[in-house]
Amino acid sequence: MWCHRLSHLQSRLQDLLRGRVTRWALQQSNFKSLFPLAIYWHHTASKSLNCVWQQHEDHFELQYANNVMRFDYVWLRDHCRSASCYNSKTHQRSLDTASVDLCIQPQTIHLDETTLFFTWPDGHVTRYDLDWLMKNSYEGQKQKVIQPRILWNAEIYQQAQVPAVDFQTFLETKEGLKNFLQNFLLYGIAFVENVPPTQKHTEKLAERISLIRETIYGRMWFFTSDFSRGDTAYTKLALDRHTDTTYFQEPCGIQVFHCLKHEGTGGRTLLVDGFYAAEQVLQKAPEEFELLSKVPLKHEYIENVGECQNHMIGVGPVLNIYPWNKELYLIRYNNYDRAVINTVPYDVVHRWYTAHRTLTRELRRPENEFWVKLKPGKVLFIDNWRVLHGRESFTGYRQLCGCYLTRDDVLNTARLLGLQA
């Protein structure tokens, strides 16, 4: 009896694999005794498209353009782009997701040219272009980066000879703005030259690409070494490499620097590509990279100078990555503002110190340091989520102005110009 049933099952499977059966429902009583759950298989192939799909009990599997993708049925119903489910004018969902049966399955599926049609139990039809599914599948997104970047050390950046953009070209032409943003997105830093050395013109420059992010330091900040704020930046001391506002829950995205005047020596700006250093850690000690991406740390800013009373706390790991493609998108590194480590047990702490030391060594390698002397008329934009900055000590009177920009608005401007961001 068992031999007969298994032989029959094997025969039916061979028929399916030869393409003789396009729909096979294992619902007969003799099969139910072999399998506790009914299994539905749908198999359609298009040689011209190299497309194969199968309908499983709990998901839809698609093989297309050398990719194997799997889609949950609720997901397929939820992302329907029909007129009743999606407003194409506002690009917003109209369907009430909570109304979708969590056990929903399509009644029929068929392929017409490059479009898949799903007919649901209530008769509603959802259609998907194969390329749209590939682009928006988890498997497709896992292979893509959100923002292409060129990682650099001092030699790589200098050999690239990335040009600065002229002030007037930046303000008056889309091409100048696009070239600037392309350089900024790729390298995490970019320069604008021939800027009148005033706070007003620096502000005008910043507003060309983004809203200015007002913080506890104001909208546009102007500082010298008078220690008017409770921060080491307001001194003549050297500053080690760091990212700013790690004590914000969302650190400021972009920083703008313009040296309006310097009557003295020293004061060069240090720039280090934090993503380049992190990549070295990933290659040499992947387990330490992973630890730095998982251990949450507190950063703190306490100020009690004159009328400036602030107590800011931000929490997050040193390295922040997207979970689906492991792409690094933010480094939160500031040894000045790191608070007490009390967010992990003792047996993790020492491993974290070891990993942090590995990253610090990479960040401090002389070959990774790019030094630049900021002068009146030359404005520097820094991706504060990627590039660390510091400075050497200086003498004499030095005036700087600048601001922070909202990251979302900078990326918005870039996308509207056709850049990937």
UniProtKB/Swiss-Prot annotation:
Matching InterPro entries: AlphaKG_dependent_hydroxylases, GBBH-like_N, GBBH-like_N_sf, TauD-like_sf, TauD/TfdA-like, Trimethyllysine_dOase
Catalytic activity: N(6),N(6),N(6)-trimethyl-L-lysine + 2-oxoglutarate + O2 = (3S)-3-hydroxy-N(6),N(6),N(6)-trimethyl-L-lysine + succinate + CO2
Modified sites of kind N6-acetyllysine: 236
Chain positions recorded as Fe cation binding sites: 242, 244, 389
Gene3D superfamilies: 3.30.2020.30, Clavaminate synthase-like
Cofactor: Fe(2+); L-ascorbate
Coiled coil: none
Keywords, sorted A to Z: Acetylation, Carnitine biosynthesis, Dioxygenase, Iron, Metal-binding, Mitochondrion, Oxidoreductase, Transit peptide
Protein localization: Mitochondrion matrix
Transit peptide, UniProt annotation: 1-15
Physiological role: Converts trimethyllysine (TML) into hydroxytrimethyllysine (HTML).
Family from the record: Belongs to the gamma-BBH/TMLD family.
Subunit description: Homodimer.
Database matches in PANTHER family: GAMMA-BUTYROBETAINE HYDROXYLASE-RELATED, TRIMETHYLLYSINE DIOXYGENASE, MITOCHONDRIAL
Name of protein: Trimethyllysine dioxygenase, mitochondrial
Organism this protein belongs to: Bos taurus
